[in-house]
């Protein structure tokens, strides 16, 4: 997802 509250992309 793009605007998810728990989306971490390191």
UniProtKB/Swiss-Prot annotation:
Keyword Secreted among record annotations: yes
Localization per record: Secreted, Cell wall
Annotated GO CC locations: extracellular region
Chief place of localization: secreted
Superkingdom per UniProt: Eukaryota
Keyword field: Cell wall, Secreted
Protein name as it appears in the record: 17 kDa cell wall protein
The species this protein was found in: Arabidopsis thaliana (Mouse-ear cress)
